[in-house]
Amino acid sequence: MNEQVIVQRDPHEPLKTDKREKNWAQHAELIAALVSGALILAGWLLSGYQVLSIILFLLAFVIGGFAKAKEGIEETLESKTLNVELLMIFAAIGSALIGYWAEGAILIFIFSLSGALETYTMNKSSRDLTSLMQLEPEEATLMVNGETKRVPVSDLQAGDMIVIKPGERVAADGIIESGSTSLDESALTGESMPVEKNTGDTVFTGTVNRNGSLTVRVTKANEDSLFRKIIKLVESAQNSVSPAQAFIERFENAYVKGVLIAVALLLFVPHFALGWSWSETFYRAMVFMVVASPCALVASIMPAALSLISNGARNGMLVKGSVFLEQLGSVQMIAFDKTGTVTKGQPAVETIRIAEGFSEAEVLEAVYAIETQSSHPLAQAITAYAESRGVNQSGYISIEETSGFGVMAEVSGAKWKVGKAGFIGEEMAAQFMKQTASDVIQSGHTIVFVKKDDQIAGCIALKDQIRPEAKEVMEELNRLGIKTAMLTGDHEDTAQAIAKEAGMTTVVAECLPDQKVNEIKRLKEEFGTIAMVGDGINDAPALKAADVGIAMGGGTDVALETADMVLMKNDLKKLVNMCRLSRKMNRIIKQNIVFSLAVICLLICANFLQAMELPFGVIGHEGSTILVILNGLRLLK
C-alpha cells in the first residue's frame, strides 16, 4: 500500500537535519487523517444543515484522501497496473454518488488512518537507520607533524593519524597506535558492556571512547568503514521484498481488476436475475467494492518484516533481506562450524608428547620454525607455547602448505611435517597414539602430529574451550525442533567429545573446507531448509550453499559480505532469539492473511444476503486493516 522511503545521504555531506521539518513530514499523513476525522465529526454534528454538512464531508474527502489518491494515480501511471488505493477512492466516490456522504468520508478517514499506521512502521525502520547514521561523527581531530586540527571525516584517508579524546566517538576505522581505554561498541554490536582496547587493537567508527585518550592510525577511508557497510546493509534489507510480499504485490493488480469487473457485473445482473431495484443493485455494488478491497491482505507482510528487521538491527543482528527471515523461520537444521563458532576460537596447547629418540627442545624448535610462517589459529597457539618454553626464532624458511591438512618444510637438512594424521600417515599416527597418547584424543583435544623424515617425532594436543552459552543454545534450538550439526576438520573422537559437551545432535568430522559445501547439500536433502553458522571467512562457500548463511562476524568486513545474517556480537543466544522471532513473524503473516481473507469473505456474504449496510462494511473492512498492521508491529519489541 505504501512505497517505502529510505533515508540516504551523500557520505561526504554532514548529518544536519531540521527536526521540526522532518517530524512534520513524517506525521503529515496522520495529521491529514485526524483533520479528516474532525471534519467528519463536524459534518455529523451539523447534519441538520445539509449543504454545510456535505461541504464538510467533501473537505474530509479531499484532505484525507489526497495523499492516497496521488499515490495510487502515480503508481498506476508508472507501473501500468491497478492498485488498492484507486479501488478505495472509487468506492468512496461511489458512496457519495448514492448519497452516503458520511460513509464515504469515514471510509477515506479510516483508510488514511491505516495508511498512516503503515507509514509509521516504515518510518520507524528508517528512523532506526537514521539514529544509527547520527552516531557517525562529522569531524575528526587530525594530527599532522605533532599538531592537531579539526577536519571533516570525509577528508580522512588510510594512514592518517587521529586523536580520540575521552567521551568522543571514534571518527574512523583504525588501529590504536598509543593509549588504552574502554569502548562502548553498542552502536555496532548491541552489547552495552564496554570493551577494553589497547595499543594494536582495532577500533570502529561510531563507537564511544569511555575514558583514555587514543592516537589511532586510520586504516580505511570514511566511505569504506564498517559503519558505512552496516548502513548500506540495513538499507538493502529495508528495500528488499520477500517472495510472499512479491506475490501479494503481483496478486494485488489482478485482484483489483477482478473486483472492478465484478462491480460492473453487479451493477446490472442482480436487477435482472434477482429482481433487485436499481437503487438496491447500485448500493450493493458499491458496498461490494468497499468490502472486497484487499487493503488488509496487502498490509499483511511488509509491516511485520520491517518491524523484525528494525528489531534485529537494534540488537546486533543484521539481516540482508526479509526473505532470509522467512527462511530462518522454517529452518529444520542449523549446521555450525566448530572453531570460533561452537568454540571460542582461541585454542591453546595443553600437552605435548615426544617419541623415543627425540627431545622436546628439538621438536619445538623445528615446529616453531615452521609454524611461524603460518597464520592458522593452531599454528599461532603452538608458536605461543614454544615461545613460553624459551624457543627463539631460527630465521625464515620456505614452507609448503596443504590446505586443511598440514605444513611441510626442510629444517636443518631434515624434512619435517606438521599436521593431521592423514598428512603424516594414518597407520603411523594411530600406532603412536595407541602407544603414547591414547588418553588425549578421548578428551576432545585437537591433535597436531610432528614427523621428521620417516619417523613420528611427537604430537601436540590443543584444546579450544566451547562458548559458555553453547550448550544452553543447543538445548533451546532442540526445544524449538531444530536439529544441530557440527562441521569440523578434527578427528572423529575429538569432534564427538566437543559435540557431546555442547549437546549437538549430529557431527561431521574430518571435513575439509571444500567438503563443507557437499555436506550442506547433503543435509539439505535430509532435513530441508538449512542454516549455516560460521566465521564468514574460510567457510564462505558453505554459508552461500545454505538457505541462510549466518556469520559470527565480530564486526568483520568479510562476514558482512559473505553472509545473509551477521551476529555483530559473537553471542549465539541472539541466534536463538532471531529464530524465535522469525517463526513468530511467519505465524503473524499467516494470521494476517487468513484473517484478512476471512473478513473479506464474511463481508461479501453479508452484503449479498442484504444483511449489512455500508457503514458496517466500512468499519469491518478498514478495521481489519488496522488490526493486521498492529499485529505486525508486535515484532518491534
Curated annotation (Swiss-Prot):
Its biological purpose: Couples the hydrolysis of ATP with the transport of zinc into the cell. Plays an important role in protecting cells against oxidative stress. ZosA-mediated zinc transport is required for post-transcriptional control of comK and competence development.
Transmembrane segments: 43-63, 89-109, 258-278, 286-306, 599-619
GO CC list: plasma membrane
Keyword vocabulary terms for this entry: ATP-binding, Cell membrane, Ion transport, Magnesium, Membrane, Metal-binding, Nucleotide-binding, Phosphoprotein, Translocase, Transmembrane, Transmembrane helix, Transport, Zinc, Zinc transport
Stated family: Belongs to the cation transport ATPase (P-type) (TC 3.A.3) family. Type IB subfamily.
Pfam annotation, one family: E1-E2_ATPase
Active-site residue numbers: 337 (4-aspartylphosphate intermediate)
Protein name: Zinc-transporting ATPase
Membrane topology: Multi-pass membrane protein
Catalytic reaction annotation: Zn(2+)(out) + ATP(in) + H2O(in) = Zn(2+)(in) + ADP(in) + phosphate(in) + H(+)(in)
Disulfide bridge partners, by residue number: none
MF annotations from Gene Ontology: ABC-type zinc transporter activity; ATP binding; ATP hydrolysis activity; metal ion binding
Residue numbers binding Mg(2+): 535, 539
Family matches, as CDD domains: P-type_ATPase_HM_ZosA_PfeT-like (cd07551)
Primary location group: membrane
Observed effect of gene inactivation: Disruption results in low transformability, which can be rescued by the addition of excess zinc.
InterPro entries found in the cross-reference section: ATPase_P-typ_cyto_dom_N, ATPase_P-typ_P_site, ATPase_P-typ_TM_dom_sf, ATPase_P-typ_transduc_dom_A_sf, Cation_Transport_ATPase, HAD-like_sf, HAD_sf, P-typ_ATPase_IB
Enzyme Commission number: 7.2.2.20
Organism domain of life: Bacteria
Organism: Bacillus subtilis (strain 168)
Compartment(s): Cell membrane
Induction note: By hydrogen peroxide. Repressed by PerR.
